[in-house]
C-alpha cells in the first residue's frame, strides 16, 4: 500500500518540476518520505544532466546588463522561448554585472540568491530535460553601449554587442553597435589583427592571383589590394559605415568625437 497521496505527488511536482510518473516513483522508492523523494529526484536530475553532456546546444540567447554580456545555450528554440529559461539568463547576467568575473568558470561560482550560477543552471536543466550551457561572458567597465538583436520576433535575442568607448555621443556609439551586429567586424584596428592571420591572408591572395595567371610583376600590387579588401571587411574602423557607405566607421566616429576602445560580439551557436 502506498505511503503517499495524490496531493504529495502534486506537491513534489510543483517543487521539483519533475514529471508525474517520476514523482510517483520517487515517493514509492522512499516509502513516502517527501524529503528523500526530493533528494532522489535531484540526484536523478543531476545524472540526467550528465547524460545530456554530449548533446549539441545550438540554440539559446544573449543577455546584457551594466557592461556584462552572456551567452546561455540550450538545445531547442522551444526552450529558448521558455519564460523560466529567459528569467535564468536575466539572473545570470545580473550576477555577472555584480561579480565582474574573469571568465565563465568564475561566473559559475557567482551567486544567484542562495545558489551558485552553476547550481541554478543545473537545476533548470534537470527540470526541463535539456542540456543548458553557459558558453561565454564578457565584462566591460568603461562607458558601454549594448545592443541585442532578435532574428525573429518570437525568439529571444541571438546576437549581442558591447561597445566600450570614450566620448559623449551615445547615438554614435549605438550606431557602431548596430554596425558590429550587422557586418560582424572581428577586429577594432589593423594593429589588432594577429600577424599569422595577416600572413595567411597575404599568402592566399598571392597564390590565388598566381593561379589566375596574373603577371608575376603585378603580384605585389594585386596582393596588397586584396589584403586591403580583407581589412575593410574584418576591421571595424575600416568598414564602410552602414549609415553612409561613402565614409568609414572611423571617419564618422572622428566627426562625433567618439573613440571606441574595444568591443565584443556574441552570436548564439557561433564562434
From Swiss-Prot:
**InterPro entries from the UniProt entry:** EF-Ts_dimer_sf (IPR036402), Transl_elong_EFTs/EF1B (IPR001816), Transl_elong_EFTs/EF1B_dimer (IPR014039), Transl_elong_Ts_CS (IPR018101), UBA-like_sf (IPR009060)
Naming one, the record's GO cellular component terms include: cytoplasm
Subcellular location, record wording: Cytoplasm
Q: Which GO terms describe its molecular function?
A: translation elongation factor activity
Q: Which PANTHER family match?
A: ELONGATION FACTOR TS, ELONGATION FACTOR TS, MITOCHONDRIAL
Function, as annotated:
Associates with the EF-Tu.GDP complex and induces the exchange of GDP to GTP. It remains bound to the aminoacyl-tRNA.EF-Tu.GTP complex up to the GTP hydrolysis stage on the ribosome.
* Name of the protein this chain belongs to: Elongation factor Ts
Q: What taxonomic lineage is listed for the species of origin?
A: Bacteria, Bacillati, Actinomycetota, Actinomycetes, Mycobacteriales
